[in-house]
Amino acid sequence: KVDNIKFIDCQTVHIFSIGKGGKHNRTVLKGIVAVAKLKEYISRAEKMNNDFLLTKAEARVPDGLHYCRAMCAQITYNAVLQDMENDPAKRAEYIQKIKDEFKRCGRKLKENLDKPYRLRGYNREAALSIGKPVVYDRVAAMYVSLFILHHFRTDTTILHYLVK
């Protein structure tokens, strides 16, 4: 819904939603181009006197929505990775955010965030065939999983969103 979108600045937007099981989600959209595109969707919705960004027909096209989620996931993964590379102290901050979110949701973090996620078998071959990495940073992947895609597992995020 349009009312669930909060502009932080010219290149940052927070989108609030309630997901499965009543989990309160916040998706962070970053980048001047992405924010400008979102403003276009909001403007169109307002002109159509619609509370929602997408029409019912658009929302029924899963490929389009999945593509948008995958692009947002990939952009955020790379931004988090870059952030941690530029300032190694940020890694501990991301880990703490992940732990706090698991605690807030009453879940137990079972993954070892210090161990890279390595694709194997068919998924490894598929990634290599399209020029994608076969090793992923688990902290960046889990951050994307929790705060962008609202999953609790890195394997789902990596296989269905980052390797696409």
Predicted regions and their residues:
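Short, basic/aromatic-rich helical patch in the C-terminal catalytic core of site-specific tyrosine
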Residues: 65-81, 145-146, 157
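C-terminal/domain-terminus segments
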Residues: 37-42, 159-164
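C-terminal catalytic core of Y-nucleophile DNA break-rejoin enzymes
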Residues: 19-40, 50-72
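Short, polar N-cap/turn motifs at the start of nucleic acid-interacting alpha helices
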Residues: 83-160
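Short acidic alpha-helical/loop segments enriched in Asp/Glu that coordinate divalent cations
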Residues: 47-56, 86-91
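Hydrophobic core segments within long, regular secondary-structure runs in both alpha-
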Residues: 2, 35, 142-146
